Amino acid sequence: MAVLINAKMDALLESTSRSFYPTLKYLPKKIRGQIGLLYLLARVADTIADSKEGETSELMKILTQYNEVAQGKSDLLPDFTGLAEIQDNPAEGELLLNVQDVIDSLEEYTVPDRERILECLDVIIGGQILDLERFGVAKEGGEISALNSN
């Protein structure tokens, strides 16, 4: 497939999305890169939210900080080194170590495209934060998390 975003992002996209990446060729060429970048941005958030270690409040803080940087509201990107080291999937660890490059790739697109991508990302991260609030950190061994009764 031709370059979607740029060589580095394409490699991250291919390594983190084995089943999604091949389907991009079926989308119109005009939007493949934007959809691919949104996938990477969302995958960063998903990797943070699904981390099996750390306190719920800390993961929510990291998600919020990540979103604020992606949305252009802050320049203080969290240090993802610790989270990257605990990932079972090495490609997800590599993605976390390259978050700034993923965010910087937004500049490849027009302002309206960036706005749409970031609007979608904001909704996705909002849902992930809500899941963390309701269910807490992902648990090993298929343990079920109960909802609060209120």
Residues of each region from the PLM?
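Acidic catalytic motifs of isoprenoid enzymes
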Residues: 1-150
